[in-house]
Amino acid sequence: MKFQMRKCKECGEYTLEESCPECNVKTGVIFPARYSPQDKYGKYRRILKRQQMEK
């Protein structure tokens, strides 16, 4: 089992659980994705960024 620090988006409580023990809302992982030089989704990110800049 892999434990990752998680944070509730509603109340800001930190936990290791999938849902917040205080307000029972689904929590999110607070760490960014691991860096890889072989960026699989870089092409799509650049396309999206270019589209947003054109607006």
UniProtKB/Swiss-Prot annotation:
Recite the UniProt keywords alphabetically.
Answer: Ribonucleoprotein, Ribosome biogenesis, rRNA processing
Q: Does the keyword Ribonucleoprotein apply?
A: yes
Q: Which GO terms describe its biological process?
A: pseudouridine synthesis; rRNA processing
Instruction: Cite a single GO MF annotation.
Output: snoRNA binding
Its family remark reads: Belongs to the NOP10 family.
Tell me which NCBIfam families the record gives.
PRK13130.1
Name the record gives this protein: Ribosome biogenesis protein Nop10
